[in-house]
Regions:
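C-terminal ends and interior cores of transmembrane alpha-helices
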Residues: 37-51
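Multi-pass alpha-helical transporter architecture, strongest
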Residues: 46-47, 124-142
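Hydrophobic core of transmembrane alpha-helices in multi-pass small-molecule transporters
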Residues: 53-69
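A late C-terminal transmembrane helix in Major Facilitator Superfamily
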Residues: 79-118
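A membrane-interface helix-boundary motif in multi-pass transporters
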Residues: 27, 109-129
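Helix-to-loop junctions at the C-terminal end of transmembrane segments
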Residues: 13-26, 113-114
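Intracellular juxtamembrane helix-capping segments at the cytosolic ends
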Residues: 68-82
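Cytoplasmic membrane-interface "Motif A"-like loop-to-helix N-cap segments
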Residues: 22-36
Length: 142
């Protein structure tokens, strides 16, 4: 079960990049919004899925696929929005914010889980974050 999430993440990144370029004609916000919406749906399903249910592994794979998939579209936004001359700086700024919020978010998520004693709450938190991103991402413009 532990491998399902990262395997899904790896394939999601490839699929998201390809869909962004080929199907959505480099409209990054569409693939980001779609994948994050589907990630929210998968995370909600994981939250309600009973422990050791046979759908746990495939659902976790899909959760990783749709949660991490938008990463490739995020990084492609840097040259799209900032041009080649500033793409490296833009990527660095995006990485900085990603790691700062990850660093701040992990203790908060850990506290919520520890306070409630329910590890599945991580999926509810991920679902809320993904749904928020899905709603906001269509406003990204080139």
């Amino acid at each position: 079960m532990a491998l399902a999430l990262p395997v899904g993440m790896a394939f999601g990144a490839i699929a998201s990049g390809w869909l962004s370029d080929r199907v959505f004609h480099s409209n990054r916000s569409r693939v980001i919004s779609l994948f994050l919406f589907l990630a929210a749906a998968c995370s909600v399903a994981m939250y309600f899925l009973p422990r050791d249910h046979w759908l746990g592994v495939p659902m976790l794979l899909l959760t990783g696929f749709f949660t991490y998939g938008p990463q490739s579209a995020f990084w492609a936004l840097c040259p799209d929005l900032l041009g080649r001359a500033r793409a490296g700086t833009g990527t660095g700024v995006m990485n900085t914010f990603a790691y700062v919020f990850a660093g701040l978010g992990e203790p908060l998520i850990g506290w919520v889980i520890e306070s409630n004693g329910e590890t599945s709450l991580v999926f509810a938190i991920v679902a809320a974050a993904c749904l928020t991103g899905s709603i906001i991402s269509p406003f990204i413009r080139r």
